[in-house]
Amino acid sequence: MVLYPPDDPFLISFTLFGLPIVVRWYGAIIMTGALIAALLASRRAVARGYHPDHVWNQLMLGLVLGIAGARIYYVAFEWERFAPNPWSVFNLTTGGIAIHGAIIGALLSTVIYTRYAGLPYWDWLDVCVPGFLLAQSIGRWGNFFNQEAYGRPTDLPFGLRIDPEYRVPPYNDLTTYPITTLFHPTFLYESVWNLVGVGILLWLDRRFGRLAPPERRRLNPGDLLFLYGIIYSSGRFWIEGLRIDSLCANGVGGSCEGSIRVAQLVSMVAIVVCGVLIFLNHRRPFAGTPTVRPDGDASPVSEAR
């Protein structure tokens, strides 16, 4: 089954009173992923004794900082492209965002919101991170509609058809790579990997986390965040090796010859750092187990030490 993105990247496109009303598939999918992730997080929040409104209150801040972080991260490595017209940085319709930047933005929003709402940082992150990964899994389908995040040519039956105008050199040469050339759907690989990762995190939390019977609890607050970092980064590292439109230290596309794939470098660092943090978190826990306030407020009180 060949995967072939639609020619039109717009879900909605019309003019109202002379003003263009446009909704791209990419944006709609990102928003859908964020809302579904928030639904998951709100259910997890209730199970841990938090009020679900905390999730929805943080959502807008998370979206703003996530998108800003994704754009800033991308622009930082592609500044030569934007330098002639710096205002183009704000034109997101031209493409150019990076998942690692979005993750940084989401984590920053958690720091800000937990301080504002008086929530225990590490435990609240454990509530949210399965939702982060679920949003990433859904959001990757935006790459399908944008015809991006694809890999090397393949003869697999579920290869991805990419129109020539969306291909990076030399794959836009139709003499060597005809229109029928199929490419690895790396967006799909990462989407499936992330979805499996969501299942693993939920299983570990239910089996060994705070909601497990006391005798089975093995996870400290913050562990799910670090496991999320390891799971996501492990998949991203090997999938990134298949891509031909990677963000490289010296630009986008090709094999990154003479340079490095930024996502692979960040993934390696994240795996090591998260592994060390899990070790340290079990030597001396970063936070104690939160308890519910006796006044009926569902927001837990941290016993941090």
Curated annotation (Swiss-Prot):
Gene Ontology biological process terms, A to Z: lipoprotein biosynthetic process
Please name the pathway: Protein modification; lipoprotein biosynthesis (diacylglyceryl transfer)
Localisation: Cell membrane
Q: Does the keyword Magnesium apply?
A: no
List positions binding a 1,2-diacyl-sn-glycero-3-phospho-(1'-sn-glycerol).
R140
Gene expressing this chain: lgt
Q: Which residues cross the membrane?
A: 10-30, 59-79, 92-112, 182-202, 260-280
Q: What does this protein do?
A: Catalyzes the transfer of the diacylglyceryl group from phosphatidylglycerol to the sulfhydryl group of the N-terminal cysteine of a prolipoprotein, the first step in the formation of mature lipoproteins.
Which enzyme class?
Answer: transferase
Tell me the GO molecular function terms.
Answer: phosphatidylglycerol-prolipoprotein diacylglyceryl transferase activity
Q: What is the lineage of its organism?
A: Bacteria, Bacillati, Chloroflexota, Chloroflexia, Chloroflexales
Family classification:
Belongs to the Lgt family.
Q: What membrane topology is given?
A: Multi-pass membrane protein
Extract the PANTHER family matched here: PHOSPHATIDYLGLYCEROL--PROLIPOPROTEIN DIACYLGLYCERYL TRANSFERASE, PROLIPOPROTEIN DIACYLGLYCERYL TRANSFERASE
The protein in question is named Phosphatidylglycerol--prolipoprotein diacylglyceryl transferase
Q: Which UniProt keywords apply?
A: Cell membrane, Membrane, Transferase, Transmembrane, Transmembrane helix
Which InterPro entries is this protein grouped with?
Answer: Lgt (IPR001640)
Q: Say which domain of life the source belongs to.
A: Bacteria
